[in-house]
Amino acid sequence: MTILSDVKALGQQIWLDNLSRSLVQSGELAQMLKQGVCGVTSNPAIFQKAFAGDALYADEVAALKQQDLSPKQRYETMAVADVRAACGICLAEHESTGGKTGFVSLEVSPELSKDAQGTVEEARRLYAAIGCKNAMIKVPATDAGIDALETLVSDGISVNLTLLFSRVQTLKAYAAYARGIAKRLAAGQSVAHIHVVASFFISRVDGALDTTLPDHLKGKIAIALAKAAYQDWEQYFTTPEFAALEAQGANRVQLLWASTGVKNPAYPDTLYVDNLIGAHTVNTVPDATLKAFIDHGTAKATLTEGVEEAQAQLAETAALGIDVETLANRLQEDGLKQFEEAFEKLLAPLV
């Protein structure tokens, strides 16, 4: 038994926020699953680093450059292969929990973030190309992405809705998910296999606020926001309206804590893992944070502790003239830009 097993017993899955060919082929990912990791997330920045730093791609890049393909098609060929291989490694985990864990995420192109129809078409194509039941398609939580979520859920595709910073936007996502489920049920189709995670980004909130907050609030607001978002989640998914969908096989969306590596070296390296453990959630962690948590983390149901204190901290932040919803919109735009830049960088050597 490891600390990851203890976390799983508390109802939270720990996923790895990393993917590369070396990770898959070396047996390292399989070893992480034995330790208790339950899934994998990727994004354009992760693949950009993998392609740049992993020698195992060199031969395939050279071969793909001999073919009449666009840089994006070359990228997708390699990324889909990696995700398919990771899905294979995670399949036993997926099947052992009746399809509730063991997912691997691949993101749609960042250039589609404001294009709902384009997102739907690419998500369908990527999902079919991967061809694995434990694949999740990652879609940014813009208004267009939330529209796409509804359609993809009604298609029967599992989705990782990413770049959430806003409680308001997260609630909109839950409603879109419920509409997609209702449409699928109305068509007489099964919904039990569909899983959606709402990826709520953590450390970037503190990174943006810590320069403007008084000392006693520094390093506190991201966790406070997550605790408030979890209260919202509990309220939404215990309504009679959702209970009616649940009775027909629908799963609850799960909050996934993302960006949980600590950016400020003054903070404990397991800050955003230790303090965000709760039932029906996921935490996707980079390698260094995973190692730190296994070494000296604490497995305790902390997400429902100190909720009143969290609300007070958010109220004090608002009283200082800081609107966390306005901040959320800015952080999402910044995140989209970062992924677009990483995607351009990723494609450049594939021309």
From Swiss-Prot:
Protein name: Transaldolase
Reactions performed catalytically: D-sedoheptulose 7-phosphate + D-glyceraldehyde 3-phosphate = D-erythrose 4-phosphate + beta-D-fructose 6-phosphate
InterPro entries: Aldolase_TIM, TAL/FSA, Transaldolase_2, Transaldolase_AS
Coiled coil: none
Organism of provenance: Neisseria meningitidis serogroup C (strain 053442)
Family: Belongs to the transaldolase family. Type 2 subfamily.
Gene Ontology MF terms: transaldolase activity
Record keyword Oxidoreductase present: no
Function: Transaldolase is important for the balance of metabolites in the pentose-phosphate pathway.
Main location as per UniProt: cytoplasm
Residue positions of the active site: 138
The gene coding this protein: tal
PROSITE patterns attached to this UniProt entry: TRANSALDOLASE_1, TRANSALDOLASE_2
